[in-house]
A protein has these predicted regions:
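Glycine/tyrosine- and acidic-biased, solvent-exposed loop/turn segments at the edges of beta-strands
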Residues: 1-310
Length: 310
């Protein structure tokens, strides 16, 4: 059965075990004055004040053990001034400032062990300037910059024990410029270039332990454009595909370790399986082993049996 909301005076609700659940006051049909909520064990869970139906003044939330969880200040229903929160062990967990309901000034979060987790600044609810994030062991996890609420400039990410993980650059909240990733043991993992949030230019995916590049691609407006190349650890080229506008694969070439061309196939369109034009295979001495001419993936002349399963 629903409780009838009074126009004036108190309203009280109870838990099933008989303990008080809520106590609120009304004036002219609106919440007004002190309100309190309780846990089933009789411990206060929340308390605060209303003014003309809106939360106003200090509001406090508690853990079941009686420890304060959060203290908020409100004005006309909006957060105003300093807001604090605590871990259940009593250690402060968060400190923020608000103006007219918007985050304003410095904000800090802490781990339960007292170590800072995040610290940054806001103006009118928008992050601005440097934001730092830390691991629970105290080492830095993230450093980034904001301008007018958007990511701008260099951003750095670290692994838990101090090794650099990522280095990114933003402009107007979009990736822009060189971006670099590392493995936890320090070896560079990937390197890419962006413009206005899209891959543009050279991207390297992996290096051998001796520093030799494993794979390299070129992009234009987020699509593979021109060469996609693989190398062996000794620096010789293994294979290379040539693209136009992303998936239009036009040519695929392989090389032997001695540098001699092993095979070269031509394609057309977006379909990976559509061979079109000349397909050639060589032996390690540069002598042609087989040649065929394809049109729309059908062999129209040459050594079909050699190429049919390729």
């Amino acid at each position: 059965m629903d409780l009838i909301q009074p126009k004036d005076g108190p309203r009280t609700e109870y838990h099933k075990n008989g303990q008080k659940l809520t106590e609120e006051n009304y004036k002219d049909g609106k919440l007004n004055g002190k309100w309190t909520w309780w846990y089933e064990n009789g411990q206060i869970s929340n308390e605060g004040n209303y003014k003309d139906g809106k939360r106003d003044g200090k509001q406090t939330d508690y853990y079941k053990n009686g420890q304060i969880r959060e203290e908020r200040n409100l004005k006309d229903g909006n957060l105003e001034g300093k807001q604090n929160a605590w871990h259940e062990n009593g250690q402060i967990s968060e400190e923020r400032n608000f103006k007219d309901g918007n985050a304003e000034g410095k904000s800090t979060k802490w781990y339960a062990n007292g170590q800072i987790e995040i610290e940054g600044n806001c103006i009118n609810n928008r992050p601005i300037g440097k934001l730092n994030s830390f691991y629970e062991n105290g080492l830095k996890k993230l450093e980034m910059n904001f301008k007018d609420g958007k990511r701008d400039g260099k951003e750095t990410v670290w692994y838990e024990y101090g090794q650099i993980k990522e280095e990114r650059n933003h402009k107007n909240d979009k990736l822009d410029g060189k971006q670099t990733w590392w493995y936890e043991y320090g070896q560079k993992r990937r390197e890419a270039n962006y413009k206005d949030g899209k891959l543009n230019g050279r991207t390297i995916n992996g290096w051998y332990e001796n520093g030799q590049i494993k794979e390299e691609r070129n992009y234009k407006n987020n699509r593979i454009h021109t060469n996609w190349t693989w190398w062996r650890e000794n620096g010789t080229k293994h294979s290379e595909m040539y693209y136009i506008d992303g998936m239009k694969r036009l040519k695929w070439t392989w090389w032997y370790e001695n540098g001699q061309k092993e095979a070269e196939y031509h394609f057309k369109g977006f379909d990976y399986g559509t061979r079109d034009g000349r397909s050639t295979n060589w032996d390690e001495n540069g002598q042609i082993e087989a040649v065929a001419i394809f049109k729309d993936d059908e062999c129209i002349s040459g050594d079909y049996d050699y190429f049919k399963d390729l």
